[in-house]
Design a protein with these regions (language model features):
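PLP-dependent amino-acid enzyme catalytic core
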Residues: 1-373
Length: 375
């Protein structure tokens, strides 16, 4: 399959070019030329399939034309060496637990898949010394560093904001050594992301160092995140709760929810999505006004969502042909303060004995009918 740029000013690229380059020549984000709907029989029997079997069917729709079936299957099965259980929290509210991977971050799925896919392409081409740049507010750095650790021909550079990453996550990517280098930046996540983007915009530097990105701007990082939306639906179906499913995604850089929207375009029976923001409510404001106004990020206790200019908004716009009406018809938005997040963590523990992290609390609060009326 070919990939085009969201800016529409660059030549189409192969999957290999899109993965290795990360960003298109016109600085746009790569998008697949087509999104293949999966057949109805897949959805009819999805509740009988394992996570790996479901993920392989989804991966084949995206990558099957470019990667041999046995290789793709091995990449999928190696990536998904852990479960992603759907756990009931309250009546009709479930939590898809994405923290069972090696670094306890939801990005373990995308990070591990990309590491294996990029490793395959590099080995295939006999390429050496590819440099992966990644900006992180915590979880991306951990997941990508762990996924790429020890992969031949690849060196990873993690840029993270000083004093704005949890101690355990900082240790997860600063103590590995080998082919992982961590760089502390005196600034915010947005500053780190700007540095990564600036490196890609420097054509000479890009070519000399063979740069690619492991942030969700890379198609190999964000597309595999679609796997677990299908698995969540399978688990809902097993529980007899698959009708009129609403999925709320705590959202920062918008790679995760974009992967879910791709799933919906492939026929995944989801009624609508909710993007839950903290005080960095750029998308929420876009839904209200129709205007996208990025601004410097604000530090919150849901720090992985502290993004003032979400990169993947360009993909959301492209997916819906720039139509605010079409986006609003399928995606709702919410925004919460630190005080509201703390309140939700406390109340959910008290009422349901389920411990939410601050990001999950944003998602739960949006789904809780006491807090939000769903359309």
């Amino acid at each position: 399959m070919k990939y085009y740029s969201t800016n529409k000013q660059a030549p189409v690229a192969s999957l290999q070019e899109a993965v290795v380059k990360g960003l298109a020549a016109d600085k746009g984000l790569f998008m697949p030329m087509s999104i293949k709907p999966l057949p109805q029989e897949f959805y009819d029997t999805i509740d009988t399939l394992s996570f790996q079997e479901i993920a392989y069917r989804v991966a084949d729709a995206f990558f099957g034309e470019d990667i041999p079936a046995d290789t793709l299957k091995q990449i999928v099965y190696d990536t998904l060496s852990f479960d992603v259980p759907l756990v009931k929290v309250a009546d009709n509210i479930y939590s898809l637990e994405l923290f069972h991977g090696p670094t306890l971050a939801f990005k373990d799925v995308g990070g591990r898949f990309m590491a294996r896919l990029l490793g395959y392409f590099i080995k295939k081409e006999g390429q050496k010394n590819v440099n992966v740049l990644v900006a992180t507010s915590g979880d991306t750095g951990s997941a990508v560093a762990n996924g790429f650790l020890g992969v031949d021909g690849i060196h990873v550079y993690v840029l993270y904001p000083k004093g704005k990453v949890s101690e355990i996550q900082e240790k997860q990517f600063t103590t590995l050594g080998q082919n992982i280098t961590a760089l502390e930046v005196d600034g915010t996540f947005d500053d780190c992301q700007a540095l990564v983007k600036a490196a890609f915009m420097d054509k000479e530097l890009n070519e000399h160092l063979s740069l690619t990105s492991a942030n969700s701007i890379n198609v190999a990082r964000f597309l595999p995140q679609a796997f677990y939306y299908f698995y969540a639906y399978a688990q809902l179906k097993r529980a007899g709760k698959a009708d009129n499913a609403v999925i709320c995604v705590p959202s920062g850089n918008f790679g995760n929810i974009t992967a879910g929207l791709f799933g919906k375009k492939m026929g995944l029976p989801v009624k609508r999505f909710i993007a839950a923001n903290n005080r960095n409510d750029i998308f929420y404001q876009y839904l209200q006004t129709g205007k996208y106004n990025p601004r410097p990020s604000i530090a919150t206790i849901a720090n992985a969502m502290d993004v003032g200019d979400p990169s993947n908004f360009a993909r959301v716009l492209d997916l819906y042909n720039g139509s605010h009406a079409a986006i609003s018809a399928e995606i709702s938005g919410t925004t919460y303060t630190d005080e509201q997040i703390r309140e939700t963590v406390k109340e959910t523990w008290k009422e349901h004995h389920y411990l939410l992290d601050p990001h999950g609390a944003c998602g739960y609060r949006a789904l809780d009918r006491k807090s939000t009326r769903l359309n």
